[in-house]
Amino acid sequence: MGKPTGFLEYTRREDTSRDPAERVHDWEEFHLPLPEELRRQQGARCMNCGVPFCQTGMVYEGRAFGCPLHNLIPEWNDMILSGNWGHALSRLTKANNFPEFTGRVCPAPCEHACVCGIYGDPITIRDNELSVIEDAFASRRMRPRRPPQWSGKKVCVVGSGPAGLAAADQLNHRGHLVTVVERAERPGGLLMYGIPNMKLPKDVVQRRIDLMTDEGVTFVCGLDASDEATARRLMSEYDAVLLCCGAGEPRPLGLDTQGVTGVCYGTEFLKSAVERAQLGKEKAAVPSAAGLDVVIIGTGDTASDCVATALRQGCRSVTQLVRRPQADYLDAQGRLPADYAHQEAQAVTGRDPRRFGVQVKSLVTGENGALAGVVTTDGDTLPCQLLIGATGFAGCEPGVCEAFGVTADRTVRTAPGGYATNVEKVFAAGDMRRGQSLVVWAIAEGRSAAAEVDQYLMGYTNLARSV
């Protein structure tokens, strides 16, 4: 603790943001970092608590508290204060493989557990984390680190989302020969296709993929592991297989959409938007929202991202229907929190896009089954040519589970407290095992699964488990 009075002298200052009315016209990142002097002041606010709950990562009565990666937060906050960025990087990456991801998209449960936040404002832990890793890339401290020797053991990681990448990174540094297979055209999974560029730039994801490739990880794209012949081949060619395919099965909308065009799920809409805007794909599965009246069902990050994406595509109008009443979302001061997308909609349209306590009752169609509008439970009819469902996920897609013969019921069943499935040498981790969760929990799952796979291969492990 370099400055015992830091939390008394300095107030919380978050990274600034670009003007909502301006940023909706491009796909560039909207957060702007603080100057180094102000960032060091934010590091000085850390109290170096006797019990740093920020890094506990525990689940109590069904609620998660603190960082599941057990980030050494007080240590690198102190190093930010002293300007020792290199040492801060070494302590940060000891627990977190991808701070450039969590520093952008994590809801920061560490800050909710910050002792400084009990009677004041918590430390800007997420922003501080991002500043350390971005400084490391800018100063070229982040260089490829190949293992000193290879074990000769071959591991296949199926899926290249945050859990799969974290496991691959850990196992590669342990010296195993790691191949990551991905059914999409590019690796990254949710990070590449499920989060808009303005929140998580795709060049940031690709930068990490390139670094891992230089360190020895092999990526194979366009390979669908739900094919039984492919699954058998992978099991025969590799000493261990780790399934990290996410929980991408969307929760049904409960509407009669048979024969109706203009209805999709949030993940489909976001993926198509990324493919067009960032990956240069001319045709995508879901049409652009340009010139359309868009209605989004659901709340949470995916729904907000769909609002922001529709605005950038030039929609005519956008409305977000939230099932629960507005009172359920008010903070302690009776204010309604607004996500970045809601701020943008307010700036562009002059109104909050959310309507609370309302659901879609039925659909209105025109010629050839084209969606024309939606009838809501309060008796209103909204014009709508694109209806997007963002109501969460039911679990993992069954195809890969069936191909590998692993037992699953929405999520893959593994040994109690572990990651081994009912099939010899096949493991599972991430949302596929845990269910829909945060990127930071997926990374924690990947790290812990890597330790178990390493134990299986070598008879012992020196890899750390996060959960």
Show where each model-derived region lies.
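FAD-site-proximal beta/loop scaffold in flavoenzymes
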Residues: 261-291, 386-436
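Glycine/serine-rich phosphate-binding loop and adjoining beta1-alpha1 elements at the start
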Residues: 40-44, 48-56, 62-145, 213, ...
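Feature captures the FAD/FMN-dependent oxidoreductase FAD-binding
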Residues: 87, 149, 154-158, 206-255, ...
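Beta1/beta-strand and adjacent pyrophosphate-binding region of the FAD-binding site
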Residues: 150-163, 289-297
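Long hydrophobic segments that form regular secondary structure
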Residues: 289-324, 363, 380-388, 393, ...
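C-terminal catalytic lobe of FAD-dependent flavoproteins
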Residues: 13, 18, 23-34, 42-45, ...
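Beta1-alpha1 glycine-rich phosphate/pyrophosphate-binding loop at the start
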Residues: 5-32, 41-44, 68-80, 118, ...
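A conserved FAD-binding loop/helix module that cradles the flavin
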Residues: 303-308, 313, 432-463
